[in-house]
Amino acid sequence: MASRDFLGRFGGEKGSSSDKAGGGAGEPDEVVELSLGLSLGGCFGANSGRDAKKPRLVRSSSLAAMYSLPGTSDDLAAATPPPAPLMRTSSLPTETEEERWRRREMQSLKRLQAKRKRLERRTSMNSGKSGGSSSRDDAQEPLYPSAFQLRRSVVDQGNTSSSMPEQGSADGAEAKSTSSMEISSDNNNNNNASNQNKSLPPPAPSPAGKLPNGIVKEQPPLRTLRSLTMRTTSTGDLRKSMMEDMPMVSSKVDGPNGKKIDGFLYKYRKGEEVRIVCVCHGNFLTPAEFVKHAGGGDVTNPLRHIVVNPAPSVFL
């Protein structure tokens, strides 16, 4: 008790002396609390007396709506804003969900139908190609066994006729005559069969490679001397036809600036404008431009200054 009174008296005396000094100087007094009493917020807490009118510092807190200093209900109501109303969550209506599921089911059904149609079309195409190739092979197969069977029958008949035992002179003569007649008939049949095979066209060679899905891979035709000669003749005919369609022309211009320019008449259709390709530059020119290019200038009738050469030119 004595220590508390002493501290309080010491603090009171200090405060009174400071008040007196402050009053004499005319400056605002600041009372420093030296007591050991606990307060809210330390020296910045709630002070009684003249400091109660000063603005108080709010103690920091983790919650924004709670303050360290208690206040009146009116102050709290004015300071804290009213909470915003919570929006209630709601799911989509059942009708829209059903429509969405129904639309997805229709799309999946359409995709399955399209996939099934593609598979059916592919299988039908593969079966048609395999059936055509098998029928072609069946049509080509009978050509070989027929000739082979004929030759085998002739050989067998010759062997049987040569291995027959002789039974007397008369029987041997009859056997020889019959065997000779059979051999001659067999030879005739063999000749007829060979003639028929020669008259028939040769079978098409079997394709060398087949793809896994049954498609036959066509081989490029072999180049022969006949094909090369036909190619040369065809190129010659093509050149002649090209010369007939696009003849060579040349300019005929008189004057100091006139010069001879070769070109060829470009193929044109009915209703189109005539075009001439000059050999020197390869430009497509009209008759007037062609004559002007040769140095003739502007002329009224440019076709009179152009000569057609039926003979082929050196440039072709």
Curated annotation (Swiss-Prot):
Q: Which GO terms describe its cellular component?
A: nucleus
**Which keywords are on file for this protein?**
Nucleus
Q: Which InterPro entries match?
A: Ninja_fam, Ninja_motif, NLS_NINJA_AFP-like, TDBD
Composition-biased stretches, type Low complexity, lie in 179-199, 222-235
Which regions are flagged for Basic and acidic residues bias?
Answer: 99-108
Similarity comment: Belongs to the Ninja family.
The name under which this protein is listed is Ninja-family protein 2
Q: Which organism is it from?
A: Triticum aestivum (Wheat)
